[in-house]
Amino acid sequence: MEIPLQEQESSLKSSSEPSSSTSEPVVNTQGSDNQGEEILSQLYRPLEACDNKCYCKKCCYHCQLCFLKKGLGIWYDHSRKRSSKRAKVTASSASDESLSANTGDSQPTKKQKTKVETKGLTDLGPGR
């Protein structure tokens, strides 16, 4: 099962020469460099408006803006409205008054409790 010398020499020559399969990765690395530069340029480019209203997985990841809005749920468009100190003071005093009014109505007074207890003790009803 020995290979003749001519075939061995030809196989050595073909292995030392760059084949089409070895030249493809070189092209791919150059292409990937271009892709990397393109991705970086897209990263630093300002986000463009996207009017896509769909929330499916494909639409959530199709552009960076949709990913931020739909995928992560981050909205930078709305600014927070800060209320003044006066509004906080009046809101807290109004909430205190409403809480005291609600708690007074919801709990029975001591007089009502004693009436229920005495009535339960006097009325024995038919028992054993």
From Swiss-Prot:
InterPro entries: IV_Tat, Tat_dom_sf. Residues 50-66 are annotated as: Cysteine-rich. It is found in: Host nucleus, Host nucleolus. Residues 7-24 have a biased composition (Low complexity). The modification Phosphoserine is found at residue 92. Residues 79-88 have a biased composition (Basic residues). GO terms for cellular component: host cell nucleolus. Residues 1-37, 79-128 are annotated as: Disordered. Residues 25-34, 90-109 have a biased composition (Polar residues). The phosphorylation by CDK9 does not seem to be important for transactivation function. It holds the Pfam family Tat. Signal peptide: none annotated. One of its GO terms (biological process) is positive regulation of viral transcription. Interacts with host CCNT1. Associates with the P-TEFb complex composed at least of Tat, P-TEFb (CDK9 and CCNT1), TAR RNA, RNA Pol II. Interacts with CCNT2; the resulting complex is unable to bind to TAR RNA. Transcriptional activator that increases RNA Pol II processivity, thereby increasing the level of full-length viral transcripts. Recognizes a hairpin structure at the 5'-LTR of the nascent viral mRNAs referred to as the transactivation responsive RNA element (TAR) and recruits the cyclin T1-CDK9 complex (P-TEFb complex) that will in turn hyperphosphorylate the RNA polymerase II to allow efficient elongation. The CDK9 component of P-TEFb and other Tat-activated kinases hyperphosphorylate the C-terminus of RNA Pol II that becomes stabilized and much more processive. Extracellular circulating Tat can be endocytosed by surrounding uninfected cells via the binding to several surface receptors. Endosomal low pH allows Tat to cross the endosome membrane to enter the cytosol and eventually further translocate into the nucleus, thereby inducing severe cell dysfunctions ranging from cell activation to cell death. Through. The Arg-rich RNA-binding region binds the TAR RNA. This region also mediates the nuclear localization. This is Protein Tat. It comes from Human immunodeficiency virus type 2 subtype B (isolate UC1) (HIV-2).
